[in-house]
Each structure stands twice: as structure tokens, then as C-alpha cells.
């Protein structure tokens, strides 16, 4: 049976990784309908590496740099499949990923998103992602307060409903995936499989948090707060916004981080993150980045040891 899944890959300066990523798609036991790569104004040889693969499944689209959200949206708009399987240009799939997604779609129809578990590759070892342990339709907002349910490279979306929600928020440089997950999970069920079929590259050089710059966007997590929404829904919004604000503060965005600390002070679940943000934001800017990096390294070391 012909696949109804289009693979969507935003690409920006990944000439060393993109061939490996594409080979992981072409090695799938169940082949996709197409692979759409949107080169978002790369300044290295990324586009040339894509062309060298030479697969008829691959369609390369080149555009001026507009950000990862615009690249993903462009790919979904150009796609033909009912579903869009997201994959970043430095992550990879295990050979059975698409087959597992197709099995989930057959077993749990009418969901807005389907995802699997993943491993984190830090360049030295694989560490299991902290994800749910059971299969099926999940209570997304409750699960996402303590686990990773959706990350871009492990998630396949029903394409047209996502586009009808506006797609990914263009101009948002960090947290754009969580912004969309919030809107999607408020309108559609989310399905999950604990099979670890994705490798997320923690060693990537230009992940959004590593290259944060001031945003020029009309989108904000504040827009997602709904007084009438379930508590877990608003708690998820606060969690995403405060996590982003930590990075913003470390990069010198004192006023923006202070605004987030004030607006999302309603959180009960993430009081520790709120306190950490307030303390970090009160320090001299030159201290913030090194302190946050040290904290994150310690947290990652603890996670790897399973403590």
C-alpha cells in the first residue's frame, strides 16, 4: 500500500549531518510518499549534500532565511501526504520508525499527532529520553508536565489540521514546537508509542537554544493562557514559557525574562523553575550564561546516571 506520509525536513547549515539524516529516512522498512527538504538560506554546502543523495523521493526547496517555523510550514504546504513526519536535519530515525507510525495510525485513527520515544545522542553515548512508558492515546498536558511526549523529530502530524491552526509560529526562535503542541493538543488527541525509534542529537551546533537572538514575532506564550482551560494545559504553557525565559535571561534579555516571571507566576507545578529564573535574572548578565550552562551540565549528568 502506498504511503500517505510526507517527511518534512527544515535545513540550515547542516552539511556535515544532513546526508546521515536522509540515509536514515531512505533506510526505513516502510518508505514515505516523499521527502521534502526546505533549505532555509544555508550558507554552507547543505543543499549540495542533499542533491548528492540523488533519490527520486527527495524534493529540495530553497528559500531565503526565515527561520525553522517558516521552513517547516513551507514543507507542509508543499507536501502531498495526509501526514507530515517531522525530522530535523541532524537527527535520525531507526529503520522501523515510519512503520511504527503507520501502525499507530491504523490502531488509533483520528489523532492529530503520533509520536514515539527517542534516545539522546550526545556524541558519546545514547541516553533514553524521559518519555511515557505506555502506548495509546495519552493525556498530553498531564504527561508533558513530567515527560517528553512530543519532540519534532519523533512526531508525525495530521497535516491539514495543523495548517488550519496556523502551523508553527513564524518568527519564534525557541519554543515554537511547544507553542504548536499546545494549540494542537487542545483540539486533537495525541497518540504515543514507547518504542525508541529516534536519535535526537544533543551535540548539534545550532539548536535554537544555542543561537537564541531577540525575536521578531507576533506570537507569545502569553497568548496561550486560557482562564477556562484545564489546569494542566495552562501549567504546560507556563513550563514552556519559563524554560524559554531562562535562556532569554542568560542571553541578556532581562526585561523579557522579568515579564515572563511575572505573567507565569501562577504556576504551581514549576515553582522551582520560577525561583531559578528570578534568581538568574537578578544576577549580572555576564554570570548568567555560565551559571545556567553549569546547571544544565549537572542536570544532564544526573539524567544519564538515572538518578
Predicted ranges, named:
Residues 1-214:
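Nucleotide-sugar donor-binding/catalytic module of glycosyltransferases
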Residues 123-126, 244, 283-287:
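Short, solvent-exposed polar/charged micro-motifs at secondary-structure junctions
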Residues 143-144, 196-204, 208-235, 254-267:
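Catalytic core of nucleotide-sugar-dependent glycosyltransferases
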Residues 181, 218-221, 295:
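A general structural signal for well-ordered alpha-helical segments in protein cores
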Residues 237, 241-244:
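Structural register within alpha-helical repeat arrays
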Residues 247-248:
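Residue-level signature for tetratricopeptide repeat
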Residues 254-307:
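Membrane-interface aromatic/basic loop that binds lipid-linked glycans or pyrophosphate carriers
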